UniProtKB/Swiss-Prot annotation:
This is Alpha-crystallin A chain. InterPro entries: A-crystallin/Hsp20_dom, Alpha-crystallin/HSP_16, Alpha-crystallin/sHSP_animal, Alpha-crystallin_N, HSP20-like_chaperone. The keyword Zinc applies. The keyword Chloroplast does not apply. Signal peptide: none annotated. The modification Deamidated glutamine is found at Q6, Q50. The lineage of its organism: Eukaryota, Metazoa, Chordata, Craniata, Vertebrata. Zn(2+) 2 binds at H107. Keywords: Acetylation, Chaperone, Cytoplasm, Eye lens protein, Glycoprotein, Metal-binding, Methylation, Nucleus, Phosphoprotein, Zinc. It comes from Bradypus variegatus. The modification N6-acetyllysine is found at K70, K99.
Length: 170
């Protein structure tokens, strides 16, 4: 259960001096409107918490799709180069690890590391798995699903009987 910790009411007006998201996963990636005017969101209600709407490419959050034909993982790794990434399959799991050592950027020095693990569906063909990194930093891990002929879709004809059913009426 997530519990929002609020500053006392007399400190909410001093919001700029008491930042609410000092160290979050978007540290160093720019400011939101709520960072510039935090007192507007905190005076509405003590339980109001503004959600962060970001596009999929900017969120750092993965998306997993498992449909009838394939299994796909999309993961934003824009801060990592292919040499910084390791993707491996261990049993029924795929593990994606990214790490780059401390390096200098516009704001000082930064290092990043993440580790994600996803369960592979049992129907995925593990011999045909693939992984690619797009120019905009989106890692795509995919694999086709094995189609079992006994579980394939087939139409069942509906026949009409002339006599009434013997099902009990309610």
């Amino acid at each position: 259960m997530d519990v929002t910790i609020q500053q006392p009411w007399f400190k909410r007006a001093l919001g700029p001096f008491y930042p609410s998201r000092l160290f979050d996963q978007f540290f160093g990636e720019g400011l939101f409107e709520s960072d510039l005017l935090p007192f507007l969101s905190s005076t509405i209600s003590p339980y109001y918490r503004q959600s962060l709407f970001r596009t999929a490419l900017d969120s750092g959050i993965s998306e997993v799709r498992s449909d009838r034909d394939k299994f796909v993982i999309f993961l934003d790794v824009k801060h990592f180069s292919p040499e910084d990434l390791t993707v491996k399959v261990l049993g029924d799991f795929v593990e994606i690890h990214g790490k780059h050592n401390e390096r200098q950027d516009d704001h000082g020095y930064i290092s990043r590391e993440f580790h994600r693990r996803y369960r592979l569906p049992t129907a995925v063909d593990q011999s045909a798995l693939s992984c690619s990194l797009s120019a905009d930093g989106m890692l795509t891990f995919s694999g086709p699903k094995i189609v079992d002929p006994s579980h394939s879709e087939r139409p069942i004809p509906v026949s009409r009987e002339e006599k009434p059913s013997s099902a009990p009426s309610s």
